[in-house]
């Protein structure tokens, strides 16, 4: 059966996201996404190219660099600006938008995972193109995350 993430309507032009439920505890999912070396494995935009420079586990204030490609290759510097263990992880690249994961542990042991691209405080000229594709890329990322997490013992 094909998995799909729900694309969310935030009601705000520069805030796009998606949500999925993963059959795993929040701590397991958070451990995976808090390691930026895993981001290329789940990236739904196909822009993250791995070979990341940075820590094995992110925390508030962590800086990490991702090799990216959108037409031409480039390196994106990021800084963690939001962090609550097993609940929230958000980072900002140079464009000043925030990429954010929110995890909510459910009573049945599964976890609701929401990812946002929040460009409300970023220069709008940089966000105009981003909002045209980010929600679909986020939905694909969440489906990839679910597949990997649920396959791991």
Question: What is the predicted function of each stretch?
Answer:
Residues 1-54:
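Hydrophobic ligand-binding cavity/cleft-lining segments
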Residues 18-20, 76-82, 98-105:
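Hydrophobic/aromatic beta-strand elements that line small-molecule binding cavities or substrate pockets
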Residues 23-26, 83-86, 106-108:
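Short loop segments at secondary-structure junctions
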Residues 28-30, 60, 74-76, 101, ...:
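Short acidic, gly/pro-rich beta-turn/loop elements at beta-sheet edges
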Residues 37, 41, 121, 146-153:
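Secondary-structure transition/hinge residues
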Residues 50-96, 112, 140-153:
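Glycine-rich portal/gate segments that line the openings of hydrophobic small-molecule binding cavities
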Residues 92-140, 145-147:
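Beta-strand/loop substructures that line and gate deep hydrophobic ligand-binding cavities in soluble
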């Amino acid at each position: 059966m094909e998995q799909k993430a729900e694309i969310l309507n935030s009601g705000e032009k520069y805030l796009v996201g998606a949500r999925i439920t993963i059959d795993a505890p929040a701590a397991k999912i958070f451990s995976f996404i808090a390691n930026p070396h895993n981001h290329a494995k789940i990236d739904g935009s196909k822009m993250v190219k791995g070979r990341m420079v940075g820590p094995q586990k992110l925390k508030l204030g962590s800086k990490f660099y991702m090799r990216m490609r959108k037409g031409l290759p480039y390196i994106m510097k990021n800084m963690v600006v939001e962090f609550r263990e097993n609940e929230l992880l958000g980072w900002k690249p140079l464009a000043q938008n925030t990429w954010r994961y929110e995890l909510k542990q459910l009573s049945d042991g599964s976890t609701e995972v929401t990812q946002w691209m929040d460009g409300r405080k970023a220069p709008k000229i940089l966000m105009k193109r981003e909002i045209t594709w980010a929600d679909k890329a986020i939905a694909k990322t969440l489906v990839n995350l679910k597949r990997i997490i649920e396959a791991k013992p």
